[in-house]
């Protein structure tokens, strides 16, 4: 079919794929992070689960949601989910996880362009232990860098309790200097 032919283009069309990857990867990565870490992980946490249990469960669901895969590819995706979830807790937001996911996808899909087109990335169902180890090392480096930057910038990882209480107690006839 014409649709499947699009995915079989040769590396001579690399620039077309590169543009498509640059335009779509950030949206796709952000959507996955919002779903798995922003929604699913927070739902688990709000049900009383320990936040680290929520990280593990959301990482498991994230890895399983990526379809058929061998043990090493599953471990690769599960580890990425663990690190992205840890970034949410350690940095106080989804931004670092989204950035890490975007970088991962840009490298993975960008590399696949030079190996034969998008069909290489779309059809990935297995990887060897060495490739998984290489990926996990890269994930860890990105996660540590993001965490270090958030610490260096003194990013608040949670809302101060007094601000939360002020917002909860705020009424329409409160003073104009209310922080909410």
Predicted regions and their residues:
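Conserved small/polar residues in nucleotide/adenosyl-binding loops
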Residues: 2-10, 170-175
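Transmembrane helix-loop-helix hairpins at the membrane interface
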Residues: 17-166
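Membrane-interfacial helix-loop-helix connectors in multipass membrane proteins
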Residues: 5-12, 119-121, 125
